[in-house]
A protein has these predicted regions:
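Sec-dependent signal peptide recognition
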Residues: 2-9
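N-terminal signal peptide c-region/cleavage motif recognized by signal peptidases
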Residues: 13-15
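A short, Trp-centered hydrophobic/proline-enriched beta-strand micro-motif
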Residues: 20-38
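Structural recognition of beta-strand segments within beta-rich domains
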Residues: 38-41, 46-50, 54-60, 65-68, ...
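Beta-turn initiation residues at beta-strand->coil junctions
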Residues: 59-60, 77-78, 150-153
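Acidic/charged, solvent-exposed loop-and-adjacent secondary-structure segments enriched in E/D, K/R, S/T
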Residues: 76-99
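A short, amphipathic edge element
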Residues: 101-113
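Gly/Pro-enriched, hydrophobic low-complexity segments
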Residues: 116-172
Length: 172
């Protein structure tokens, strides 16, 4: 279940730019807020989305790499060899819908509404298994790119992901 939370928190932010065939890359910061703790656990890294998959590299505080290719999820071991992560398969179709910003597929999984904050949407899961993990997602975009995602977990913890695209001029 922990891998499921990680996969969804890592990958839910791709709906806007995944629809293009052009590879997108950038950096991220992820703040994981746990109930009962005053300071969040913060990680930073980089990502690259290409037609053939996604690479998500955490640089700090602990280096790790997550890959999605051909409907499968992998992590890299100490020798940089991909290791299949069993149990992640049920989420690949959902993740692909998010990555492609397939609103028809997303509407099957979520109730989607505009958020009070301009440029943001709230997604409420319909699936019982997904509801056990998350109460809602907030997706925000700026200049046609995902800028922030907030994942509210059912247990009260939440994660905030922020994205930057340093190698791409921001659209006006």
């Amino acid at each position: 279940m922990r891998l499921s939370v990680l996969l969804l928190s890592v990958l839910v932010f791709f709906p806007v730019f995944a629809s293009s065939a052009v590879t997108e890359q950038g950096t991220f910061s992820q703040e994981k807020h746990f109930k009962g703790f005053s300071k969040p656990f913060i990680s930073t890294g980089s990502f690259e989305l290409a037609e053939d998959g996604l690479t998500w590299q955490v640089e700090s505080p602990v280096k790790s790499t997550l890959l999605i290719k051909q409907g499968q999820v992998y992590t890299l071991d100490d020798q940089d060899k991909p290791q299949l992560q069993k149990g992640a398969e049920p989420y690949v179709n959902l993740l692909q819908a998010i990555l492609k910003h397939d609103e028809v597929a997303l509407a099957e999984q979520f109730t989607m509404t505009d958020h009070a904050e301009p440029g943001c949407q709230t997604l409420l899961p319909k699936d019982d298994l997904l509801k056990q993990l998350f109460s809602q997602f907030e997706l925000c975009e700026a200049a046609e790119q995902v800028s922030r995602v907030r994942l509210q977990e059912a247990n009260g913890n939440f994660t905030v992901l922020r994205f930057a695209y340093p190698n791409k001029e921001q659209k006006q």
